[in-house]
A protein has these predicted regions:
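Peripheral, non-AAA+ core regions of ATP-driven protein-machinery
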Residues: 1-140
């Protein structure tokens, strides 16, 4: 029996000083054993995003998928740190689950830390991130 897979992409920015790199946040939801896996060279604080994202989704009145969620932060060679990827991870997961439009989500650059209640908190380095978004032709941040 084939397992049904659902995929979605969102985008964020990784900053090293004033230089930024676009990070593709890919989410896959598969019909295998439930779990939440984050891959692509995340640091310890980013690994904690799994718990923030899960709580924020549930406390926003949405349903976190009861399936295996795999989130890949690409390119894997770029170091990712901090909580600014929370929003991109959450919208990518929700788009893969069908709760948001994948096409709409992929047109934006998503930057923000999530509170456990689902609120979006500001992050540092927004100006350099906006400049990178402009360079790659993304009008929505």
């Amino acid at each position: 029996m084939a397992t049904k897979k659902m995929l979605a992409k969102a985008y964020s920015i990784s900053l090293m000083g004033l230089a930024g790199t676009v990070i593709e946040v890919e989410s896959e939801i598969s019909s295998t054993l439930p779990g939440f896996v984050l891959v692509g060279l995340p640091d310890a604080s980013l690994s904690e995003s799994k718990d923030r994202v899960r709580a924020a989704i549930q406390n926003s009145g949405l349903k976190m998928p009861d399936r295996r969620v795999t989130v890949n932060l690409s390119p894997a060679s770029v170091k990712k740190q901090g909580s600014s990827f929370d929003l991109a991870i959450a919208v990518s997961v929700m788009a893969a689950a069908g709760a948001l439009s994948s096409d709409s989500v992929s047109q934006w650059v998503h930057l923000g830390e999530l509170g456990l209640d689902g609120s979006v908190r500001r992050v540092t380095g927004i100006l350099p991130a906006l400049l990178v978004a402009k360079e790659i032709g993304r009008a929505h941040v």
